[in-house]
Amino acid sequence: MELDEVIQGIVSAIGGFDYSDDEKVYVLGDEALACLKDLKRYLQVVDEKYKVWQIRSLLSSLQLVTNDICPILSDWDKDITNYRNWRIALACVELLVPLTWPLETEHETFRENVDVLYNLRQAQSNYKNSILSYKKGSVLSAILAVLLKPLSTPAESRTLRDKGIIRIVLLLFRNILQIDELKTKNETIISFAKAHILDLIVTLVSNLDEFEHFDVYILEIVYNLIRGCKPSALFSDASLTNSQTELNSLLLKESTQNRYLKRNAHTRHNRFGTMLSVQTEDRRFTIASQNIKTDGLDELDSHKRFRKRGTRRKHFDDINKSFFINTEAGTALRNFAVEFLEAGFNPLFQSLLKDLEREDPRVLPIHKMQLLYVQSFFLEFMRFSSKPKKTEEIYSNDYSFGLAASVFDQRALIMHNRLMVESFEMKQWSTFQASMLSMTQLLFTLRSMTLCSSEIYQRIADNLLSNIFYQEEILLLVYSALKHFKTQSFGYLDAITELTIVLLKELEKFSSAKQYLYVKKRRRNQKSVDSNVLESDEDEESSLINANAAVEDRLFDFGRYESRYCDNGCIDSFVLFLQCYQDLDSKQIHRAISFFYRIFVKQKCHVYLYRLDFLRVLDKMFNDHVYFSTTNSARQDFEQFFVYYMRKLSDALKDVPALFIELPFPKLTDTFYYLEYGKSPLFSIHGSRKGPLYETVPGLSHLEKVAAVVACLINENKSDLLDELKVQLNCLISERKLITLADENKYINEGGNDGERMGKNLKGDTDSFNTALLKDGKFRLLLELCGFEESDNNIDVQALWKLPNSVIIDELVEHAMLLRRFTDDPPTFEGTKPEDLLVRKQRGNVRLPSSSEGETSDEEIEFEADDPITFANRREALNKITDRKRKKMKTNETIIDHTTRKKKENHLRSAKYIVDSDDDSETDIAFFQSEAALREKNAQKASALFKRIDDLEMEGKLQEIEQLSENSSSD
């Protein structure tokens, strides 16, 4: 027997209507309970086991719910003492749960399921309509009566079966809410309110200690009830005329649009008198309209057929789907939300927070999203429900913040931040969107707490804001989410733009109120290890700990953080958001304008907004008087920004004509300075930015040095640098030959400029070559071997190396021939690697003295830097001797560092007093002769002193050495 025949026989045996009776009462069959159990078993064995929807499809075609289940539940007398009738009603509820379960398709869904998907969804809509409206909602009352029996049992006496009945009834309520959610949300809320199901939910959450295992199902019901409803709509002053107000606004917008269209519409006569014809290679375009006289190009564009290129976009579930709520449903939902907030929000939130902390398997990823969304809704609802009436004299911010006290717990904030970071990293965009909504409402609530009259609430708000802004990870996460917006939903874009503006405002206020604001920054701290020292096990463990992510406190600079948003990605997101201005309200438009104001006016990043798409959006909004009319409250702020923007753009185009070419393209960091100021930036080359210094081992000839360096560069795959250097040398040789042919003396004395007399700068044609001039130590050594000199120019990289005039043309030709020889035939070294012939120089620490250092100090006498008998040199010699005797004393390191610093200071001081003067030449000659004699005398004393010190050292007389050093220093 076929399966459909079996199912049809079972359904027929359940019962049917008695048409002989005037009331047509439904009569149960003798085996009605057994038949209902058989249908449940078939659903489990066939549909759930094999993941097909065959039984569901058969039951929908037989209209089991409409013709059998609803009449059975409706005609039941709700007498829970009659076990047989109650058991039949329970069997009907057990069948309704799988039949109303949400239908979801996956990548591996069977083709047969996809074919019947539309019919099953239509059948579920009929199921919901029957359950809600059959005999004025008597079915919902019967379902609630089924639940009364396990609820009336004391908590300690409830069995697993009782808990299972509570669970399936709650799941049935959840399923009914999810079917045709947007279309029938108002009817569902009204039916649930009349059947006292909303009161049941409030009762369960207020006694959650007895029903702690059902917190997840209660969360799902509450989420589906409030999803898409704005709390502001529930507290509208004209709640009774909401539909009328919305209808009037739509009619006014339609009349304005019709009036605007009629003004520019075609008539019978405006097609005569003017014609434009354009002949192309393949066809002719002809337009007859009088608008060609003034708006010819626009008229041509209006006749184009734009074929928008299809893009494959990912569609994510928008959790904040809005719907219009009527008066009756709004009143019922508002009353439920008020009771839920007063009685059950804190217990439900604390219970779910515990489940998340212990990672309860009942909590699924979708429940995390629902919890965050419910939190954001009730935080906003709390401000509206507790908001006092606004009068002309006083306006208070004293809300009942205790209604949501569980949200202000430190544990809740930690969990929220964790969910926010995890959802972004795992690309769970719905959960991340809910976390952004929750963070936005939390910041709004904390702002209200700081403005209230209670000092306790003010301290709580200040503490929470400090904890939120202390996490730099969250601040950077918001910036990264805005920057990398791609194909998420519009609700996601709305949430991230709102959070960005609110976060910047609150962070600016908080940082300005605090003298110092620190944030926690994660960094990697790698421990330096000496290769010559063997570490113990403890050292290895400490190195592993130091290699992990370390945390440090860093002083927060709001201006620097705000400047991060001067980025093409962030601006792209807000431009895309503003392009939908026809669907935005005044607050959303004002939000976008305020962001552009921060970028353009406060941060003065004008160039980033000089974009053709942004200019097009502003122009379209300025000329649109239908969807962005003068009655819009954001129109005035927009016009002020638009006028200021156009004035700055006009001035920039006059000053930097290259901006005309850059308008259609995103701006790069390299060209930002030039487009902003019309000139190239000047970058200072700090000593730490330069690469390491190398030198060859002693004993090599010039030919061997060049061969070793070239071989090292070839082994490092840097032949392109050598090729470009050969090209540069050939160019320099050609220039020198031209100078020689053009009478070099005349060129130097008359025609040459200062830069060419000083030498020719080495300029690279590629970025890699210019980087090597600064960073590559081996390549810099090769330049020195080729006769180039490194200048003291710390502004431009291309002026860092130059070829002096002392290098003759024959030397240049020789260097070019050597490079060509070694690159064509790379040199080899028998038994030695070319890298072993190069050693790295030790670069000392550079300390720049302050302006007040060394100018008025009379403690020490200034000596010349090359004087062998300075105090620093004598002290250094003594330190070398004592270092041999006291290797383990740490004071030696301090003395050496001190003497090194003093030696550098003496060098700077003596160099400072060298004055270039040509007036006292005879005096200078006598002075230099006396100084030379003094240096010779001091050198003799030094040699005698060091000889005496060596003799005493051999005898081991350390005290006499120190006494001798002190006497020599006093001399």
Curated annotation (Swiss-Prot):
GO terms for cellular component: chromatin; mitotic spindle pole body; nucleus; replication fork protection complex. The modification Phosphoserine is found at residues 528, 536, 970. The keyword Nucleus applies. Keywords: Cell cycle, DNA damage, DNA replication inhibitor, Nucleus, Phosphoprotein. The keyword Isomerase does not apply. Pfam families: TIMELESS. GO terms for biological process: DNA repair; DNA replication checkpoint signaling; gene conversion at mating-type locus; replication fork arrest; replication fork arrest at mating type locus; replication fork processing. It is found in: Nucleus. GO terms for molecular function: DNA binding; double-stranded DNA binding; Y-form DNA binding. InterPro entries: Timeless, Timeless_N. Forms a fork protection complex (FPC) with swi3. FPC coordinates leading and lagging strand synthesis and moves with the replication fork. It is required for programmed fork-pausing which is necessary for mating-type switching. FPC stabilizes replication forks in a configuration that is recognized by replication checkpoint sensors. It is involved in termination at the mat1-proximal polar-terminator of replication (RTS1) and also required for activation of the Rad53-like checkpoint kinase cds1. Fork protection complex (FPC) consisting of swi1 and swi3 interacts with mat1 cis-acting sequences and mat1-proximal polar-terminator of replication (RTS1). This is Mating-type switching protein swi1. It comes from Schizosaccharomyces pombe (strain 972 / ATCC 24843).
